[in-house]
Amino acid sequence: MTKTRTLVPLALAVAFATNASAACLSDAQAAELAAHYLSRQPAANPEGLSDADGACSRAKLNALLAPRLGKVVGYKAGLTNPAVQKRFNTDKPVWGKLYEGMIEQSGASVPAAFGARPLFEADMLVRVKDAAINQASTPYEVLQHIDQVIPFIELPDLVVQAPAQLNGPGVAAINVGARLGVAGQPIAVPATRGERYALLDALERMQVQLTNNQGQLLASGKGSDILGQPLNAVVWIAQAL
């Protein structure tokens, strides 16, 4: 029997915003968004969506993308930084699906124009080992149900014409900008209680830097930027799904 492993990326900050009221994207609008995503061309902004509208629109988009992108291998959390949430007029994270074709391995080369509105972020993945993750309510409980923490350079794509005008539900509607990412060397979750608490502390206190090939600092962040502790994002995803 083959065991399915789920990857969960915990974005340091993918965020955006606006206001208004509209409805779930129509089938035609979702098809247009999917076509622009696949052709890497900016699409019209989904405007004025409620949380329910964003979730409905995300479902329509993913139904169209799945036949092209392969099986779902995990979920991503975005808008996980409270300061970013406030800046973009929302108070909660959002989630999207990751497909098998989105995950590259360390050393991969990716075109600079990999998306319509390409970005890069220092990030991390966790690999889920069993379904009991869905009952985890603390970071320590999360560690009991994952077997790897994986450094990850996420390469999201905001895909719309005016990314700064997206709100939280709008980010959900575009599947939280999921496009590509490069996974690094996995770190095994230790077996003993003491080592696991040490790992939790290290994840919260870690300093992450993204540099170019000349050593210039492009971006930086710390573990606590993700909901206070990175594995809180896993708890949130489990509850949101």
What are these regions (language model features)?
Residues A233-L241:
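A conserved acidic, glycine/proline-rich C-terminal tail/linker
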Residues A23-Q229:
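Catalytic-core "active-site belt" of small-molecule-metabolizing enzymes
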Residues M1-V8:
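Bacterial N-terminal signal peptides that target proteins for export
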Residues V8-N19:
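Bacterial N-terminal signal peptides
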